[in-house]
Amino acid sequence: MGCGGSRADAIEPRYYESWTRETESTWLTYTDSDAPPSNAAPDSGPEAGGLQAGVLEDGVSANGVPRSTAPGGTSNPEKKMSCGTQCPNPQSLGSGPLTQKQNGLRTTEAKRDAKRTSAKEVTINVTESIRQVDRNQRITKKCIN
C-alpha cells in the first residue's frame, strides 16, 4: 500500500473528523488506479483505445482531475496522493486544484454543521396515563406512571 497500512485500516480510519465522502472517493480512485493492469485482455489497454480503471472516456478521472498516460503504461507523475489519510504527512503538491477543492469542501461542511446545530428545540409532552388496548379496541388496563 505504500504507507504500511492494511485495507481494513483504510476502511475504518483513525482520523474520523477528517474522513469525508470526498476523501473516500479520492482514496478509492487512487488506490484502485495504482493496481497494475491485468494481462487477461492485452488489447483493451489505453494504447488500444480501451479505458483505464477510474478514467472516463475524455481522459478525466472519476473525480475530475485530468490524467494522461505516458508510453509504456506509466501513470501521471503529478498524482497528488497515493495513500489517502493513512500517511502521517500527506504527499501533496501544495496549491494544486485538488487542495483548493478540499478547502472549499471543508468550509461547506462547516456551514452545514452549523445549520444542524441551530435547529429548533422541540419539547415532547408525555401523557401520564397509558391505555392498553386489546385486539377488539377495548381498554383493558389503565396504568399510571
UniProtKB/Swiss-Prot annotation:
Biased composition (Basic and acidic residues): 108-119
Chain ranges passing through the membrane: none
Record keywords: Cytoplasm, Lipoprotein, Membrane, Myristate, Palmitate, Synapse, Synaptosome
Any one of the GO CC terms: neuron projection
UniProt gene name: BAALC
Tissue: Expressed in the brain.
Entry function: May play a synaptic role at the postsynaptic lipid rafts possibly through interaction with CAMK2A.
Residue span of region Interaction with CAMK2A: 3-35
Chain residue ranges for the region called Disordered: 27-120
Protein name, entry field: Brain and acute leukemia cytoplasmic protein
